[in-house]
């Protein structure tokens, strides 16, 4: 555990309650800088304490937005979501920049079309035989709301020649 005395971070002093709080959060899971900043503001830490603590954690590589984006992208893809939905969540809810999201996607290089097919198979096992317009609309709404582009899934719906 970190001592009760103040720690040095660059030229500024940082209180150990702020550092203890952030380390406790990071011990449980990854957080984006934006999420940690919001949580620390809710706890009433000063902007200087927040800046110093986050800079210290980033210097020690305890907090890294790129690593967070890669882990989040992998996790959400495994839960059945497409890139558009994941990107929106990372930007709006987690405060990650478009550049970092693109870097994470390039690093991981997932095959979104194959992923869309996997999601289709799981959610709609008879996807290749769908001819009913209402059911096709349901499939389209589901896939679009989960962040898939039409070109990633449309040609599979109602076409048996793509069945493996």
Curated annotation (Swiss-Prot):
Annotated InterPro entries: RecX_HTH_1st, RecX_HTH_2nd, RecX_HTH_3rd, Regulatory_RecX, WH-like_DNA-bd_sf
Keywords per UniProt: Cytoplasm
GO terms of biological process kind: regulation of DNA repair
Cellular compartment(s): Cytoplasm
Entry GO terms, CC: cytoplasm
Chief location: cytoplasm
NCBIfam families, sorted: PRK00117.3-3 (NF001057)
Family, as annotated: Belongs to the RecX family.
Function: Modulates RecA activity.
Name the UniProt record assigns to this protein: Regulatory protein RecX
The species this protein was found in: Pasteurella multocida (strain Pm70)
């Amino acid at each position: 555990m970190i001592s009760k005395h103040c720690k040095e971070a660059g030229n500024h002093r940082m209180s150990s309650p702020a550092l203890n709080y952030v380390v406790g959060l990071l011990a449980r899971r990854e957080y984006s800088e934006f999420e940690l900043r919001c949580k620390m503001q809710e706890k009433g830490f000063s902007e200087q304490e927040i800046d110093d603590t986050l800079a210290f954690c980033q210097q020690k590589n305890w907090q890294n937005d790129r690593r967070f984006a890669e882990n989040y992208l992998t996790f959400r893809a495994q839960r059945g979501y497409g890139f558009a939905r994941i990107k929106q969540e990372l930007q709006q809810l987690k405060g990650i920049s478009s550049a970092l999201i693109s870097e994470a996607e390039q690093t991981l290089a997932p095959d979104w079309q194959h992923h869309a097919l996997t999601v289709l198979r799981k959610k709609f096992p008879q996807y290749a035989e769908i001819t009913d317009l209402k059911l096709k609309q349901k499939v389209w709404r589901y896939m679009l709301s989960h962040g898939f582009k039409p070109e990633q899934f449309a040609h599979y719906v109602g076409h048996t020649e793509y069945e493996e």
